């Protein structure tokens, strides 16, 4: 069993989740993910790693409460335990001196892109971080990014903080301050990663996205997380989760995600979250 050190809602519907897992914290790297279960009957949920403390033996993730199993996670308190905390899984993000790197995070991806930005800065890169949200009340960890970035940009749809607009305005925004990235890394919801990949492709900006499909075992056996990259079948859990965003068949990926909607809804119906229906 794995002890919960902290579980708190940091912005509406997003929770910071800190678990005592010494073996995982000892070997985890930026870009890795873990799989958890809230109880013996719960689904296996893949969560990107947002931070870790090797001395304390803890691992931090940011998760969104969207279904029955994440609702169970959201009810956990410090001192509670969970039966499953598997990791680190997946390939770590490539870290080296690329030159100028743009790190874009939205929603739960703000958390998962943080250790990537930190490691890239430590590798000698110029790191420019962009945090994107619908409104200022959905932003978090901005102070952490200032410590690991040469500059932090904020974009909100309603203009309550930073630049008013959306990710489609990023190229113009960077052009105005003379920034041309050698590498762009995007962590967030599927639409954000897809849209940013579409924006950067004609510009020739190499773009790496952190894919988050449904998974079961996390070791490539179930095949649920497969996707087409460069015309070849890949498994997000073992070949990724990082992939070249310009090579992903986004239309196929979105269709596969939709096919699991009934199975995702059913656990929520059977949970105690009847208020959703």
Map each language-model feature to its residues.
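A generic structural signal for residues embedded in beta-strands
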Residues: 36, 84-85, 227
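Local cysteine-cluster metal-coordination motifs and their immediate loop/turn environment
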Residues: 112, 212-242, 271-277
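Short Fe-S-cluster ligation motifs
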Residues: 235-239, 243-277
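Ferredoxin-reductase
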Residues: 1-80
